[in-house]
Amino acid sequence: ALISRVLLFWKQQYGVDGFAIFGPAIPVSELGKHPALTSTRLIFSYADEQIYGEDKPVFRHVATADNHFQCCVRSYMKSDENQLHAFMQASRSNPPYIEQVNYVASHDGFTLQDTVSYDFRHNEANGEDNRDGSWQNYSWNCGEEGPSRKKQILSLRTIQKKNALMMLYLAQGIPML
């Protein structure tokens, strides 16, 4: 109830037309069925079409966004073994009643530049002793860890970033930058 009141406040006061709501114990069904939010885009880390019950929506306002697409694209991009099938499935995923949001970089992991610049995370300077963030970044430094001035490395990194964005744009679902 508190979450829906907060979302309604932001919608009415500031004209916000969509929300990304991630975390445990989110009342997905309650928010998805809320009459005042049916024209508002709601993005969750998990939702299934059961939230609609018997009534299938005219406007698909509920979407999911998780890192599955990101992991598949990054693994395929760096040529991990046996990734073509997983990449193709992730690219074609488009559930009938719930929108799928795809991304190759987000707020809780490597940026796209970091994905092509580092094999390992380097968070030593932030006071967390490099314990924060995921160890599974599916990244490849293109031949040199961190910033580089070598033209060949920079060129390969640019190509890899363009490849990642092309895979994002050509996949089914909604691309998120």
What kind of feature is each model-predicted range?
Residues 17-19:
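Hydrophobic residues within beta-strands of alpha/beta enzymes
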Residues 1-14, 24-27:
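Substrate-binding/active-site clefts of carbohydrate-active enzymes
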Residues 15, 28-177:
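Conserved alpha/beta catalytic core and glycan-binding cleft of carbohydrate-active enzymes
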Residues 21-24, 45:
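Generic beta-strand/beta-sheet core signal
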